[in-house]
From Swiss-Prot:
Pathway: Carbohydrate metabolism; pentose and glucuronate interconversion. This is Uronate isomerase. It holds the Pfam family UxaC. It comes from the Bacteria. SUPFAM superfamilies: Metallo-dependent hydrolases. GO terms for biological process: D-galacturonate catabolic process; D-glucuronate catabolic process. The keyword Isomerase applies. It comes from Thermotoga neapolitana (strain ATCC 49049 / DSM 4359 / NBRC 107923 / NS-E).
Amino acid sequence: MFLGEDYLLTNRAAVRLFSEVKDLPIVDPHNHLDAKDIVENKPWNDIWEVEGATDHYVWELMRRCGVPEEYITGSRSNREKWLALAKVFPKFVGNPTYEWIHLDLWRRFNVKKVISEETAEEIWEETKRMLPEMTPQKLLKDMKVEILCTTDDPISTLEYHRKARETIKDVTILPTWRPDRAMNVEKSDWKDYVKKIGEIYNEDTSTLEGFLSALWKSHEHFKEHGCVASDHALLEPSIHFVGEKTARKIHEKVFRGKELDPEEIRDYKAFMMVQFGKMNQETGWVTQLHIGALRDYRDSLLKTLGPDSGGDISTNFLKIAEGLRYFLNEFDGKLKIVLYVLDPTHLPTIATIARAFPNVYIGAPWWFNDSPFGMEMHLKYVASVDLLYNLAGMVTDSRKLLSFGSRTEMFRRVLSSVVGEMVERGQIPIREAKELVKHVCYDGPKALFFG
């Protein structure tokens, strides 16, 4: 039965295990929500605004089905965009987006219709009547979201995180320090960015010393607002020892308007990652490394819509073990590190790294892997090579508030099914299985990130 009680639960033990975790609070240490939207607490106007306006998963699949861009990110009305989505939605079967959006519709709106061209108008009207009462803060409470960490640039004022702390009682909203722009020295806007953070923190960032001082001040500012983790996007980690003298020369070269060669770019990024590690060591933050996403691969999307518009891909040819070796040894036992890999063929590398370094944790199946298939494969491999008990937990990685419930439910069901299979095969006693799924879903990630 579609989305029935046994959805994704493939054995009797899984049903028992899911009953232990389905109502646990949600702790999400990595997502892309905007704290401003939560604080202002404005309701959505329509179902497209809820499900399609910010979701590049939806955009990509609509493009795959031949929907013109004007019905995705263009000038068409939200109603026209929803109707265009509904028309092609049956083609999404097998992709987790098909299940997520139906779960949103069935669980949050109690509108138990299958999305199609025929039902699109009814769904539009039914949800539109309900949306005035479905504010962001109410939804977060209804979905039992206890803690969420947004992703924020070091130049952020964190004004809305402060307001959230003062005014919102049911959910804790914390920032995450994401200093990618600070280390992307090859980007054309890097120098302007460096000047801006200098203006904010009253430092002469044309010097390396001033730039590092400004970053330390930003780090402290985030700490004062409850930050517990940093987040870093690394296409391919290449972290090696680089002295401050070398980094200073590179920094000054950019400010003189000179172009860097590839080795200088790698050296500067490596130097900065080590500095970020030292900052996190000082504050006890978790360091999250997202590895293997090749950003903005489709040039036309980047030019017309900008980044984060559905043009990113996964790439395989990475030297993760070699690229992380210096960083992992430099911070051995000093820093909690979570590794997320986009290509599942790299899972053996990070799983064995985690076995070698007790301070390293394996992150959740991420981005293109957060489907039932991807999660099952990930969980089974981690359980067999490392410790499933030590998994860093579930992250939504979402730009869409409504998907917190659906993505978390899918993960908990798949986890229950995987562990339930072990019970059915006689590998685990049911009592230990119950403790395991509860730990992975809630106790473990809460302890790792929030102490």
